Amino acid sequence: MKVELAQLAGRDKDTAYNLERALAAIAACPADTQLIVFPETHLMGFPTAATVAQIAEPVDGPTVSAVQAAARERNLAVVIGMAENDNGRFYNTTLLITPEGIALKYRKTHLWASDRGVFEAGDRYATCLWNGVRVGLLICYDIEFPESARALAQLGAELLIVTNGNMDPYGPTHRTAIMARAQENQAFALMVNRVEAGDDGLMFAGGSALVDPLGTVLFEAGREEGRFSVELDFAQLELARKDYRYLDDQRLRLPGEVVEHASGVRELLIP
């Protein structure tokens, strides 16, 4: 599988600029690209409690519709973050958009300090079957909690995709976390982070990465903007799970109702 990691700078509360950059990155993908991944809340940047009502959009709004049109035109899938407005309730949301539409929606379940008072926490984990691979989404701070990735693994995830908005001085924390989450769940993990300055003096740390099911870093970006092409060989899943399978051997499983949808989406509801 050919994947493009779009490690971009963004502008907080400037949807038009961020969308333009996303559409340009999608248009520039090589013809054999199957998936492009952007950072956390890339489309809107990070709103504040005072601005979120003006900045956030529904998932069927004009900004997501423009991304859907680009995905159809290029015949590829897009994972991208947004500030979601669901009838006046606001979420830090990541979407998996295919040429057919929105295949998966995930709302951040672990809110970082600056998320609180702006967004509500999501209430479930979810995976979907895309391109023959079961995919799960996480957002930034989620990966510092092993249970988040394990929830996706219990739902069958073979590929963990993390949209990231991690800032200095916490870059090394997420490097360690993404390696651990891949290794302990014997799954591929992709993480795409923002770079350069944001509001309130934040400096985003970059370090987008691809990690294999053994926890080995196959690719790691620096701190500069860039679009990076990587390739995933899912035959490595079988090799990683040949001698032992953590999910089979674990003694304690995460609680919560599992919901299977006709679309292939599989959800674990947080009790």
Segments (PLM) and residue ranges:
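Extreme N-terminal starter segment of soluble prokaryotic enzymes
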Residues: M1-L5
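Short polar catalytic/cofactor-binding loops
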Residues: Q7-K13
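Short hydrophobic-aromatic micro-motifs
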Residues: I36-V37, R134-I139, I161-V162, L190
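CN hydrolase (nitrilase-like) catalytic-core segments centered on the catalytic cysteine
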Residues: P62-A77, E144-F228
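Active-site catalytic loop in hydrolytic enzyme cores
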Residues: N85-E158, M167-T176, A180, L239, ...
